[in-house]
Amino acid sequence: MAEVQVLVLDGRGHLLGRLAAIVAKQVLLGRKVVVVRCEGINISGNFYRNKLKYLAFLRKRMNTNPSRGPYHFRAPSRIFWRTVRGMLPHKTKRGQAALDRLKVFDGIPPPYDKKKRMVVPAALKVVRLKPTRKFAYLGRLAHEVGWKYQAVTTTLEEKRKEKAKIHYRKKKQLMRLRKQAEKNVEKKIDKYTQVLKTHGLLV
């Protein structure tokens, strides 16, 4: 059986529920999905209201033994994971298998920093929300309800961006040199190019 291609999604700028619904559908269909930068996911509605909702959720617990659940995740990646779980039949084998195909991360850890990341236009805030509507960042909400690694994630992201900038600069330089090299030998290899074109080996 052919290996299933991994779909790497950049969570930044997407709406929580819409992205979760699309991800849930994809994992049920058998795709492996990785969502990075979960701290950049948006939630529609102003921040204060969303925080009140989450604080109300934190109060829901088992009176006699709170350690039995429900479990309240604080990290943005886990909050997103739980949202997707709510859209899956996770108590069945099929749902559990689908949930196992999902990976979520805060920031962009290796090896995903070197991979092409995609967006989902149907879930983007700029597409789905009116410009005047209020929204909140999942990272800020998580930080204010107990997530302890916002500063660490921000620092690591800044380092990653700096490395990516240097890599892109080098790549551009190499492309420029390659174009120049091709231009320099264009006249020398022209007769060979024509032969290859006549045989249909070069377009």
UniProtKB/Swiss-Prot annotation:
- Subcellular location, record wording: Cytoplasm
InterPro entries recorded: Ribosomal_uL13 (IPR005822), Ribosomal_uL13_CS (IPR023563), Ribosomal_uL13_euk/arc (IPR005755), Ribosomal_uL13_sf (IPR036899)
In which family does this protein belong, per the annotation?
Answer: Belongs to the universal ribosomal protein uL13 family.
Please identify the protein, giving its name as recorded.
Large ribosomal subunit protein uL13
GO CC terms of this entry: cytosolic large ribosomal subunit; GAIT complex
Modifications after synthesis and translation:
Phosphorylation at Ser-77 upon interferon-gamma treatment in macrophages involves a DAPK1-DAPK3 kinase cascade and is causing release from the ribosome, association with the GAIT complex and subsequent involvement in transcript-selective translation inhibition. Citrullinated by PADI4.
Designated gene of the protein: RPL13A
Subunit-structure text: Component of the 60S ribosome. Component of the GAIT complex. Interacts with EIF4G1.
Identify the species of origin: Macaca fascicularis (Crab-eating macaque)
One Pfam family assigned to this protein is Ribosomal_L13
Which taxonomic lineage is given here?
Eukaryota, Metazoa, Chordata, Craniata, Vertebrata
Cross-referenced Gene3D superfamilies = 6.10.250.3250, Ribosomal protein L13
| PTM-bearing positions, type N6-acetyllysine | 191
